[in-house]
Amino acid sequence: MEGMRIVFMGTPEFAAVILRAVAAWDGGTVVAAYTQPDRPAGRGKQLKKSAVKLAAGELGIPVFQPANFKEDADVEQLASLRPDVLVVAAYGLLLPQRVLDIPTHFPLNVHGSLLPKYRGAAPIQRAVMNGDAVTGVTIMKMEAGLDTGPMLLQQAVRIEPEDTAGTMFEVLAQHGADLMLGALRMVSEGRAAFVPQNDSLSNYARKIGREEEMIDWSAPAPRIHDIIRGLTPDPGAKTFLHMEGREDIALRIEPGEPLDMDAEFAPGTLMRMQDGGLLVACGAGTYKITRLRPAGKNTMKAADFYNGRLKGMAAPYGTLSAQKQ
């Protein structure tokens, strides 16, 4: 097939990387990009364009932003584009069956895991939070179920010990772009052969809840480290510092270092400053905080926070917990 007509659907930077790659492919044309409506963001709550909308604008691709596909007019608009393929990556909206039936060939989805593992909204974050050593990318044909469709291509990718969700989004976006180009070539040449998922091996990567952003210091230090990595850069791993006679300080903790060091205090105790880091007692072991961000401030070294807030105080300095006191 020559001149494949492609409609792209996606929202964040992960998807924008894939859009740019597909738009540069010489086997077809991206005739439209669908992305979520502009959302209020930042302190001023100004409407913010998605990364896909910005990329599409740079590429001269028409943009559509329906709130959903419940209205007949939105479905008819998509059908009028006569797509051969839908390419979907982190769109964030559920697509009803009548939308999935529109393309001449397939609705293809880029999913940031080795399906059937980590179906759902947060596969990359969950893999890092769970301490997995390997994750990957899957190209699948979309169906009405959530990430349940048959698979076309997969690629495994190693999660390095220093990786965060942020670094893995970047790595997997590039792998996803390369894999999608391979999938489009297979479709255009009539070589697309899909393999069903084994539902018995599936699990669900639900969206990160607000309560999960708060660090539970009673967990073992390595587990805490994985959770912090998986929440970095967004939404961030958070805690409150309580100090006798002082107002609580809300902190966002950056990835530091889990230490195999028995803590002589209760979990959450901010024990002392040592070797450039603040040591926190955990349920098992000790966590060394090397960088953090107090509410309303920029991210700083733990040593700078110590010099500005804790120096001169007797150790232990206070207690970290998920609740403001």
Model regions: which residues?
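N-terminal Rossmann-like dinucleotide-binding module
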Residues: M1-R43
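A generic structural signal for well-ordered alpha-helical segments
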Residues: A55-A56, D132, T232
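Internal anion-binding site segments
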Residues: D199-Q325
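N-terminal glycine-/serine-/threonine-rich beta1-alpha1-beta2 phosphate-ribose binding loop
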Residues: D26, P40-D84
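Donor/substrate-binding cores of folate-linked one-carbon enzymes
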Residues: Q36, V85-E211
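Amphipathic, non-transmembrane alpha-helical secondary structure
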Residues: A16, R20-A24, E76-A79, Q97, ...
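Short beta->alpha connector loops
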Residues: P12-F14, A67-K70, Y91-L93, L259
